[in-house]
Amino acid sequence: MSFLVAIVGRANVGKSTLFNVLTNSYDALVFDFEGVTRDRQYGQAKYDDLDYLVVDTGGISDKDVGFDEFMAKQSQIAIDEANLVFFVVDGRSGLTTGDEYVASLLRQKDKKVVVVVNKVDGTDEEAAMAEFYSFGFDKVFAISAAHRRNTQKLVDKFLKKTLNEYYQDYTQTQEHKEQQRHGIHFSLIGRPNVGKSTLTNRMLGEDRVVVFDMPGTTIDSVSIPFERHGQKYTIVDTAGVRKRGKVKQTLEKFSVIKTLQAIQDSNVVVAVVDARQGISDQDLSLIHFAIKNGRALVLAVNKWDGMTEEDRIQVKQDLKRKLFFLQDYVDIHFISALHGTNVGHVFESIDTAYACASKKITTADATRLMQLAVEAHSPPMVGKFRIKLKYAHVGGHNPPVIVIHGNQVSRLPNSYKRYLENFFREALDFRGTPIVFEFKQSENPFADRKNKRSKDEGSKSKKVK
């Protein structure tokens, strides 16, 4: 489960600006769902090699109707889920009753809180921060998010240590969870009312999840262990992710976080699409998130029953056009969760994807495949020199990570990287899982000797003079 940073505070203090700084600065995948242009509320960001999620809770002002109730729902859910809270206040306008209310909520929680005093450009930082110490939090820091003043220092000072500690503990916990995990852990993701809960019940063979014919019946993720044909599984039915313009209920907003975390905790992700509505930007966002996080993937196109042949052809053409990047390795099944049509094939693809993602490859095999790929198609020239790939080894599983060492590898074009991925995928018969390639510059064993020789020669020439 990813580390979560919650940005809380009243309206117009600069939360969204800080959100953009945290995400866009670190090669972020931001969930800019259709239907909203003003606020991007959910984002994945990176610090060094560590991923984390950021949520902007939206602004609240004293003039809002139902202030207490809305704030309690909106901010408390974010605070409860968060590993670190950035409590943003306005250094220009000073302390307000809205700030005091947020502070009172935070004091009730056992959370790590940093009071971020924003908009301090052109002011005395110490003076701007002074009154906010009255909240009782020992961490108060001044920034200007709009001008990125002190924002990197904010991350280095408060996020770095907490993030590293979290992932050290998390790694140990995950190792224990993997030992205790009930078989293959897979999640069902998709928009509301695409049939995830119906598919869950069909896979379980009983009505374990309440289903109504209305969007958003499942508010939170439901995790259920079961066994089928001797294979153990744990299925997670996530709440649906709808268009941002339609995300109105506060609980539903934070179900997005649950969905993203369920993806990260899964061995395999089953993306469920409504055949009659087609694939949407929300579906694509979730699929991209799963791939970016290295999850094995299966696509289930539901509600296939009752469609005309003409409509089916149109759906397949639309899928081929929008999912061109998945055509070569992800299984797509056209199913009816209600009647059970082709659901068995979904299980087969889950098993295959998991087996491929967990497949053990030796260093000898990885190097041999790399050599065969190079023999079939050599890397391009870089100036007067050809890029040379020397050897390969496996850097991890689920997803498979292939580490290739060589010279000039930083100049290897993306087209050749795609060629290597396709070559390895075909040779290893990998289905359903991404393959991650890492390229490392080989160390020159004579570099230190050359440097020493140069220094010695320099010393000798000085003596001759």
UniProtKB/Swiss-Prot annotation:
Q: How does it assemble?
A: Associates with the 50S ribosomal subunit.
**One GO MF term attached to the UniProt entry:** GTP binding
Q: Extract the NCBIfam families matched here.
A: GTPase_EngA, small_GTP
* Protein family according to the UniProt entry: Belongs to the TRAFAC class TrmE-Era-EngA-EngB-Septin-like GTPase superfamily. EngA (Der) GTPase family.
| Pfam families found in the cross-reference section | KH_dom-like, MMR_HSR1
Coiled-coil intervals: none
Q: What does this protein do?
A: GTPase that plays an essential role in the late steps of ribosome biogenesis.
Q: Which InterPro entries match?
A: G_ENGA, GTP-bd, GTPase_Der, KH_dom-like, KH_dom-like_a/b, P-loop_NTPase, Small_GTP-bd
Among PROSITE patterns, the record links this protein to:
G_ENGA
What is the name listed in the Swiss-Prot or TrEMBL entry for this protein? GTPase Der
Q: Which residues form the KH-like domain?
A: 359-443
Q: Decide whether keyword Nucleotide-binding is in the record.
A: yes
Q: Which residues bind GTP 1?
A: 9-16, 56-60, 118-121
Keywords, sorted A to Z: GTP-binding, Nucleotide-binding, Repeat, Ribosome biogenesis
Biological process, per Gene Ontology: ribosome biogenesis
Location of the region described as Disordered in the Swiss-Prot/TrEMBL record: 446-465
Indicate the segments forming the EngA-type G domain, all copies: 3-166, 184-358
For binding GTP 2, which residues are annotated in this chain's numbering? 190-197, 237-241, 302-305
